């Protein structure tokens, strides 16, 4: 091997090392209708405004929540990547302010029919997201189905969205209980962070967190972190009706500022090496169970 070729190989290896793992954050809820997907799109926008490249992966089976929130109909979805030969970049739909999203479509539901080699190829394709994004937001389904749990136990960071309504709090605890009982769950590798949505006052969100945190710590060995609260805001309702996130439609609103504050908290949190697993390892954990 000549000196020039050796130098080229060294540069190639250095460039490969420079590819950083994307930060993977799952957003979930114990029940539907509490603002989970709304949280996903607004957090994505706030990360993007801080200079991050953000892609939302819509893993809410059969429900096109993200495309509805953005008012955008995607040309391709995950099924086109899996079954129709499309490349990963082709199925990423451009959204507002540079945020991209991948629609699950019917593709996720068909995963059960894939053999191991097909799943390996799928994971290989999805792992390219490490090069295309700094932050991946996984918008999971609501509730405690096995498909939701597979995403949560693999996720180094999970944001649990709840409201002060008793049914929402009860369902949030049920989700945490199901998570704690999953054989693949590890409290060291899966950090759960709470957002209290639709609160009347900030104190209401803090009280909700303290109560849920106390019982989850005592009975489930899950230590919740508190990210903050989103208040009742008519601007959110108006933004939803026009199929735009409130952070885009009303950037000066109270709720938009709260989403910004939450992302600032997330940005200031140090990510340990065993929590910065990247996209490849995340999807391997989801789809390639031992």
Language model features with spans:
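Short, hinge-like loop/turn segments at secondary-structure boundaries
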Residues: 71-76, 178-179, 210-213, 246
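Extreme N-terminal, non-catalytic leader segments
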Residues: 1-31
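NTP-binding/hydrolysis catalytic cores, primarily Walker-type P-loop NTPases
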Residues: 245-290
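Beta-strand-loop-alpha "switch" segments that mediate conformational coupling across diverse proteins
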Residues: 218-245, 258-261
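Conserved catalytic-core segment of NTP-binding enzymes
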Residues: 140-228
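Walker A/P-loop NTP-binding active-site region of P-loop NTPases
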Residues: 24-88
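P-loop/Walker-type NTP enzyme "switch/lid" segment
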Residues: 59-131, 241
């Amino acid at each position: 091997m000549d000196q020039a070729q050796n130098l080229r190989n060294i540069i190639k290896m250095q460039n490969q090392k420079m590819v950083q793992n994307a930060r993977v954050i799952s957003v979930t809820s114990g029940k539907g209708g509490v603002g989970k997907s709304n949280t996903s799109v607004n957090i994505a926008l706030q990360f993007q405004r801080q200079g991050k490249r953000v892609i939302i992966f819509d893993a809410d089976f059969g429900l096109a929540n993200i495309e509805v929130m953005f008012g955008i109909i995607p040309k391709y979805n995950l099924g086109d990547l899996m079954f129709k030969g499309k490349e990963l970049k082709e199925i990423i739909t451009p959204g507002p302010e540079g945020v991209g999203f991948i629609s699950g479509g019917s593709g996720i539901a068909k995963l059960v029919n894939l053999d191991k080699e097909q799943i390996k190829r799928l994971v290989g394709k999805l792992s390219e997201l490490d090069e295309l994004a700094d932050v991946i937001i996984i918008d999971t389904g609501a509730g405690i189905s096995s498909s939701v749990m597979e995403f949560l136990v693999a996720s180094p960071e999970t944001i649990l969205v709840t409201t002060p309504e008793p049914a929402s709090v009860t369902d949030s605890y049920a989700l945490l209980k199901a998570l704690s009982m999953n054989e693949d769950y590890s409290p060291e590798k899966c950090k759960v962070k709470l957002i209290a949505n639709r609160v009347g006052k900030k104190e209401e969100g803090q009280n909700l967190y303290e109560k849920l945190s106390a019982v989850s710590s005592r009975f489930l060995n899950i230590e919740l972190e508190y990210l903050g609260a989103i208040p009742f805001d008519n601007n959110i309702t108006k933004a939803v009706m026009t199929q735009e996130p409130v952070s885009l439609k009303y950037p000066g609103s109270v709720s938009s500022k709260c989403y910004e504050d939450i992302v600032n908290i997330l940005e200031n949190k140090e990510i340990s090496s065993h929590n910065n697993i990247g996209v490849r390892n995340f999807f391997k954990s989801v789809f390639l169970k031992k």
